[in-house]
Amino acid sequence: MSRIDYRSIGLKVGLEIHQQLDTREKLFCSCPAELGEEEHDEFVRQLRPTRSELGDVDPAALFEWRKGRLYIYQAPLNHSCLVEADEEPPHPINREAVAVAVAVAKALGSAIVDEVHVMRKTVIDGSNTSGFQRTAIVALGGSIRVGSKEVPIETIVIEEDAARKVGEKGRYVVYRLDRLGIPLIEIATAPVIESPGEAREVALAIGTMLRLTGKVKRGLGTIRQDLNVSIRGGAKTEIKGVQRLELIPRVIEYEVLRQLSLLRIRDMLRERGVSREELENVEPVDVSSLLAGSKSRVIKKVLSSGGKVIAVKLPRMKGIIGMEIMPGRRFGTELADYARFWGGVGGIIHSDELPGYGITGDEVEKIYEAVGGDPGVDAFALVADKPSNALRAARAVLERVAAALEGVPEETRAALEDGTTRYLRPRPGSARMYPETDIPPLRIDENILSMAEPLVPEPPEVVAMRLKKEYGLSDQLAWEVIRDERYRLIVSLLEKYRGTLEPSYVAGFFVVVLRGLEGEGVEVWKVDDAILEKILDMVAQGEIAREAAAELVKYLANNPGSTVEEAVEKLGLRRLSREEVERIVDEIVGGLREEILKRGEKAVGLVMGRAMAKLRGRADGRLVSEIVSRKIREILDSDGKG
């Protein structure tokens, strides 16, 4: 992490935690709330923005529509119906999902609404067939304690998850409807978080509390964190889709670096006398003829297919376009993002990176001359694509540069795997939300309150104390269990194997062994709970050694469909009898007799290393250690060195 004084720059972060609920049915129909890979029907739609009741068009919706996309929907036969296809009105809201949200609200001390009113939130990126997402506030206010700080909760909302994107080609985007309508709970905090580390701790605390309800899904894609980040003098930036908890601090740090860099660029532009009026008067120039003989593969490909190369002068911006604003991303990358999304092009080429990409110094001079620029102070950007796309993209570049005069634009960005972000769309306006007229309000009655009561999660501190008392877990191991997404499974297995397997081994299998495998890149999520339980059954019954468990999980993750028994046979992990272990250790000790006599008791490490190399996964390490120690003692005693 960098040494930024986050307090001095006025960092404020708000979190929105989105978590799928583990309900039997979807939020507005009776389809199962799970993913399905069965056969599917297909249909195609094109979505268009409409005016709100106040006559306004949401800018984010307009932005998506301008892409001219067509959407192909896969409708799995057992996991979607006419509601997902938007051919039938939604059913009444799922009371089970509302009860879970009420339970969470009680745990956070939030004020639960008297009636749940469903709203429509405009979304026309294709992820909702209707062109909007249904969402409903269940509670307001409350707080969660993180360390010594009470972090205020603003809203607790339930909403339907979006369709699952499975492919994209040209104008066509393919979505699968099994995920559309799965209930989500959204918990939004006030923007009072003041450091990247604190944001991670708050997200961890909320996630832990949700898991303790026993009513949330787990696995890849079931939880997502959105961040609202701002600094003094900057702007509120919404960052969507942070999938991993450990990525939160890096995403925030990089966003702070980006905003600080954009503020520096603003000051540089003002010092150089760049004005919005000047940028508005810049006209895109067709430089296709100047580059007709270019050796650039990008340019040649576009020109040969009837496209154009459009250049725009960026007055007094030499050296600024190539400035790094966060690791691996430059101001030119920001311009390219705008060009891609508003113009539908692949990207841009700018003068701060030229000569290069097959474009020569002579060609650079000709472009400067064509746009009326001074190579000593000005910059330019090139866009190569279909004429209409290239012109739109060039104007988007100019608009983004003009926005840089104000500093940091308000926008929505997408989180990337390395912690950086890219421009996603403009910030949505107030015209985005309007009432849902097809669903009657739901009164929070005694029935819902009674459904919620047993789901109210205990404080994590109370749960940790009970785990330590009942199962003898260490404080650290107890907290690791509570924070593990398999919490409910672990607790049930701690009880199942009471008196058969040590609780520390059972808990460690999940929070140490499985996490270690995940750290190695093993896709542990592919191994379902029943198989993990079967592995522990075989350990408890003495059929396999404890050390074999990790190898089995690794094999089964890489070979979905295999049974545990097949994996044991394939890997040769059937546990050896004590007599077989004794025989193998005897062979090793016999071959090292002289070394044992020379080293004495210090030979244990050498013999154990050789023994475990032969026996790993087929015999418990404790048994091997006991036999090795005894065999060495026997040799030393027989030689009179004991």
Swiss-Prot record:
Top EC category: ligase
EC number(s) recorded for this UniProt protein: 6.3.5.-
Catalytic activity: L-glutamyl-tRNA(Gln) + L-glutamine + ATP + H2O = L-glutaminyl-tRNA(Gln) + L-glutamate + ADP + phosphate + H(+)
Biological process annotations from GO: glutaminyl-tRNAGln biosynthesis via transamidation; translation
Keywords associated with the record: ATP-binding, Ligase, Nucleotide-binding, Protein biosynthesis
GO MF annotation list: aminoacyl-tRNA ligase activity; ATP binding; glutaminyl-tRNA synthase (glutamine-hydrolyzing) activity
One Pfam short name: GAD
Entries under SMART domains matching the protein: GatB_Yqey
GO (cellular component) term, any one: cytoplasm
Its job: Allows the formation of correctly charged Gln-tRNA(Gln) through the transamidation of misacylated Glu-tRNA(Gln) in organisms which lack glutaminyl-tRNA synthetase. The reaction takes place in the presence of glutamine and ATP through an activated gamma-phospho-Glu-tRNA(Gln). The GatDE system is specific for glutamate and does not act on aspartate.
Quaternary structure, from the entry: Heterodimer of GatD and GatE.
Family: Belongs to the GatB/GatE family. GatE subfamily.
Official protein name in the record: Glutamyl-tRNA(Gln) amidotransferase subunit E
The species this protein was found in: Aeropyrum pernix (strain ATCC 700893 / DSM 11879 / JCM 9820 / NBRC 100138 / K1)
GN (gene name): gatE
